[in-house]
Amino acid sequence: MDSTKNHNTITLPVIIVTPAIKIQTRSLCFYYRRQQVLRDVCLELPANQITAITGPSGSGKSTFLTVLNRLWEEVEGCSISGKVTMELGGQMKDIYSRGLPAPELRRKVGMVFQQPNPLPMSIYKNIAFPLRLAHQKNKELIREKVESTLKQVYLWDEVKDRLKEDGRLLSGGQQQRLCLARALVLDPEILLLDEPTSSLDPEASSGIEELLLSLKKQCTLIMVSHYHDQTQRISDLQFRVSNGRFRLQET
């Protein structure tokens, strides 16, 4: 009697998980007065990843960020064509539709600038201010949110006994983390970062990079950077901009 048993080999299908698309642009063009700054930009940017945008000065990198939160609308002489859609609250939305006011969009799409820009008020009020603008009146909830957000950016232990001090008295790295906290306190789905470490020393820059990596769990990050080493370290996707045109880079 042959005791040999046949063993059937089961081949399991390979499942490739593609990140969901968070931001999509189609034929996007941007003009400042008579100059075209962005040219036919067609992108699909994934959710919960860091997308880095590099390129020479004046190529359109920072302008692209202002298109994503409509900040350019505050500047005279600008115009736009094409389409920008975002997945917000579980639905794809045209961010330039009349049904989505700019203030509502900016609560979902936060922004951190190149130079730290604390408001001329206390550390506590710097974080509480956006909540009050969003009509939050519960003082206890505001207090809890300020504390949890400062902890999120690893600043709480450094400032918990100084909350009444002017935020502008903090060091450069602390100020940038304060600005990150101010952007995060409204729980944005997308965070735009315009060279967030360019004015910081190497130690502070490293701290910000680690923080950005930790934020991928909760939001999508789009970062403009001049530093190739930095984008290689922390980005999932890279684009290089030249003369208003985007080109995908290998990471």
Task: Write out the residue ranges for each language-model feature.
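Helical segment within the ABC ATPase nucleotide-binding domain
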Residues: 205-217
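Conserved ABC ATPase signature
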Residues: 164-170, 174
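Conserved catalytic motifs of ABC-family nucleotide-binding domains
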Residues: 187
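Conserved ABC ATPase "signature" region
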Residues: 85-90, 94, 140-160, 213
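Catalytic Walker B motif of ABC-type/P-loop ATPase nucleotide-binding domains
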Residues: 191-194
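The feature captures the beta-strand-to-loop junction immediately N-terminal to the Walker
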Residues: 54-56
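ABC ATPase NBD Q-loop/coupling interface
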Residues: 83-104, 164
